[in-house]
Amino acid sequence: MKTWSYLAALATALLLWTALPASAQGLQPVPPLAARVTDNAGMLDDKQKAALEGVLADYEAKTGSQIAVLLVKSTEPEAIEQYSIRVTDAWKLGRKGVDDGVLLMVAKDNPSSLRRLRIEAGRGVQGVLTDAQSKRILQDVIAPHFKQ
């Protein structure tokens, strides 16, 4: 009986913890989606941001798929994988019913244990943008820019 009471109390505590907003848990808040490129880390100048916005707008006009870029200083204490899922849940990228949105996430000051780069792809593009392709894009295209 004591074990059952303990498990019930633990389950209740976990349920209440997950119901708390991210800010109450000490997690980084998800910024509002205001543009295709959200640079909260100050990594891009205005010209770079405008150029990237243009490329993403053209891609969306041609394919219908929506790509957003989020640049933040850090996702600590949360790993980039969990943070990017919270972002895609909040932003609802892609077309409704198609789920073809993609998030490119960069957390420039994350420690290597939390990773700094992530591509989060909706189910509607996972056949075209596989995990292996995402990894290759991050390693071969995006990561080299951090070494410059």
Q: Where are each of the predicted segments found?
A:
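Folded, non-transmembrane soluble domains that reside on the lumenal/extracytoplasmic side of membranes
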Residues: 23-148
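Bacterial N-terminal signal peptides
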Residues: 8-21
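Positively charged n-region of N-terminal signal peptides that target proteins for export
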Residues: 1-5
